C-alpha cells in the first residue's frame, strides 16, 4: 500500500517534472494556509534567500535561536533522503507518524487546490511548527524570492545571503535582475540582512529596501591577519 507521504511525491515537483511544476502566483499557498487556519501566524519568522549559502545560514540561525532557549523551527529544501528532513524543531525532524497523518488528512485538499509538492510540504511544515508551539521559525526560500511560495509569510526579518546567476530559465539572466528577484522578500519597515555579494547586487537590494523603509544590515566576511611565527618542538 502506498503511504500518504509517498503520495505527496505525486504532486507536481521541480525535481521530477522540471519547470512545468512551478506555477506563478500565491493563490494556492494562500488557500491551503487559510484552510489550515493560518499556522504561519503563530510564530515569528525569518525568511532566508540567496543563490548560495541560504541553507547553511538558515541552519545556523536556527541553531543559535535554539541555543538561546527559543523553541525554534527550521524549514529547508530540498531533502536528501526523506521528506522529514525539511521540517525540524530544535534540531529534531518531524515524526513520521505525524507526517503520515497530516499528509493523509490534507492530501485531497492539496489535489483540489492544485498545490505543488513544494507548496504542500511548506504548508505541512508550518502546520507542525504551530502544533508543537514553536515560537520562532527560520524558513528557506525555494527558487528566487519574489515569486516563491514562502513570500506569503509575514517575516519579521529577511536575509539575502548572496546573489549570482542560477535557474536563469525561471528567474533572471543578469545580476541586477536576479538581485531584484531576491529583494522581493523584503517586507516594509522590517530589517533585511545582506551577506557578501556583488556591489551591483547590494545596491539594487538596498535601493528596494529604502523604498520599503526597511533597515539594511550589511555584513561582510570577517578578515583576520596574524603575524608570522615559527613553531618548534622542544
Regions found by a protein language model. Give the residues of each.
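N-terminal leader/targeting and accessory segments in enzymes
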Residues: 1-52, 56-71, 80-81, 97, ...
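Generic secondary-structure signature for well-ordered alpha-helical cores
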Residues: 10-14, 34-38, 104, 108-115, ...
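ATP-dependent carboxylate-amine ligase catalytic core
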Residues: 19-26, 30-43, 67-153, 169-171
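Conserved beta-strand scaffold positions in the cores of enzyme catalytic domains, especially
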Residues: 45-47, 72-74, 152, 158, ...
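Positions that flank functional sites
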Residues: 48, 80, 144, 223-224
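Short helix immediately C-terminal to the catalytic nucleophile in hydrolase catalytic domains
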Residues: 57-61, 122, 234
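Aromatic/hydrophobic pocket-lining residues that form π-stacking "cages" and hydrophobic walls in ligand
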Residues: 61, 125, 205
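Acidic, Mg2+-coordinating active-site environments of NTP-dependent enzymes
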Residues: 120, 136-140, 155-234
Amino acid at each position: 500500500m502506498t503511504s500518504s507521504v509517498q503520495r505527496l511525491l505525486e504532486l507536481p515537483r521541480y525535481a521530477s517534472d522540471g519547470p512545468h511544476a512551478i506555477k506563478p502566483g500565491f493563490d494556492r499557498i494562500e488557500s491551503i494556509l487559510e484552510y489550515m487556519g493560518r499556522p504561519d501566524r503563530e510564530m515569528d519568522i525569518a525568511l532566508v534567500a540567496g543563490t548560495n549559502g541560504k541553507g547553511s545560514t538558515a541552519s545556523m540561525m536556527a541553531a543559535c535561536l535554539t541555543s538561546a532557549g527559543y523553541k525554534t523551527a527550521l524549514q529547508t529544501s530540498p531533502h536528501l533522503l526523506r521528506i522529514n528532513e525539511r521540517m525540524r524543531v530544535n534540531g529534531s525532524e518531524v515524526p513520521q507518524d505525524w507526517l503520515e497523518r497530516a499528509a493523509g488528512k490534507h492530501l485531497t485538499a492539496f489535489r483540489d487546490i492544485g498545490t505543488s509538492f513544494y507548496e504542500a510540504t511548506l504548508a505541512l511544515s508550518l502546520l507542525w511548527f504551530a502544533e508543537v508551539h514553536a515560537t520562532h521559525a527560520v524558513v528557506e526560500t525555494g527558487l528566487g524570492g519574489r515569486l516563491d511560495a514562502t513570500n506569503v509569510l509575514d517575516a519579521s526579518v529577511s536575509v539575502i545571503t548572496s546573489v549570482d546567476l542560477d535557474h536563469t530559465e525561471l528567474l533572471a539572466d543578469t545580476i541586477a535582475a536576479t538581485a531584484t528577484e531576491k529583494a522581493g522578500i523584503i517586507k516594509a519597515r522590517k530589517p533585511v540582512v545582506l551577506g557578501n555579494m556583488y556591489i551591483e547586487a547590494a545596491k539594487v537590494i538596498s535601493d528596494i529596501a529604502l523604498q520599503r523603509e526597511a533597515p539594511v544590515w550589511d555584513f561582510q566576511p570577517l578578515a583576520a591577519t596574524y603575524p608570522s611565527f615559527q613553531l618548534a618542538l622542544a
